[in-house]
Amino acid sequence: MFQDISNFYKDKTILVTGGTGSIGKEIVKTLLKFNPKTIRVLDINETALFELEHELNSEKIRCFIGDVRDKDRLKRAIEEVDVVFHAAALKHVPLCEYNPFEAVKTNVIGTQNLIEVAMDEEVEKFITISTDKAVNPVNVMGATKLLAERLTISANLYKGKRKTAFSVVRFGNVLNSRGSILPLLKEQIKKGGPVTLTHPDMTRFIMSINEAVKLVLKACYLAKGGEIFILKMPSVRIKDLIEVVIEELAPKYGYKPEDIEIKIIGKRPGEKLYEELIIEEEIYNLEELEDMFVVYPYGVDGNKNNKIIYNSKDAKFLNKEKIKKILKEISYL
């Protein structure tokens, strides 16, 4: 299948929004290996675009300074594009709680803008990058990403005779991405602690950036329109993750692990104790593949399997040895 996926992207013109973020940047770097015609990277961060252009040093990269809120800019960016990966978003839960209007403008209106210009341009495939926080959301960020998902899936119903296939990829927590827990832990341990833990019972689904990008590129290749693709992911207790990181990193920075305090600070605004990958209603339209779940559009039956565990508190937790192994695989330890 790898060769089929590689061939799919060959000679394509591809647009990646949010292309300087952790996921977007890795999508761009991986796509370059498949010999596309052009990759257009749209981002609001001028400095990050400049750095990306110099890092990749490829004539296939075109950097577009722009915001998904600006529909006119999107019209220019999407001209003659074959495939869209929509990774631009406001993603930090507490910041979105305090800036809800801004979250709506980017995550909802921005997604609508991009869908509409993609439809008019009749791009071949359109993938929205979503999050497990969109499942039964309790915070602004999750609610806006739920709307982004629904807008994307619903676009298949109102596109008329246009050919674009709109689909969604739903992620768990991406390890060592910008703003995630791992970079924060490293900084706290460097300073001798304390290391902050919001709640001792908190659990999360985790995945590496490489796993995330593989899922996105495979999902886009498979997409027919209307599907939600979800990577199968392990779950961790955040407390276990923190203890492993302290045990491994404290000696590297001249501290004894037992001297690094773990300070309980309480849940942040909008934060859940556990995450969910799939809502109950989606199970009836769900198919389980080797490495992912696929939720099909309403009215399309998947394999009915009511035994699927779809929240991080009931999933089997990684033990500390396996956590350590994963952290070494992503070159964090």
UniProtKB/Swiss-Prot annotation:
SUPFAM superfamilies: NAD(P)-binding Rossmann-fold domains
Pfam family, one: Polysacc_synt_2
Highest taxon of source: Archaea
Intrachain S-S bonds: none
Family: Belongs to the polysaccharide synthase family.
Protein name, entry field: Uncharacterized membrane protein MJ1061
Source species of the chain: Methanocaldococcus jannaschii (strain ATCC 43067 / DSM 2661 / JAL-1 / JCM 10045 / NBRC 100440) (Methanococcus jannaschii)
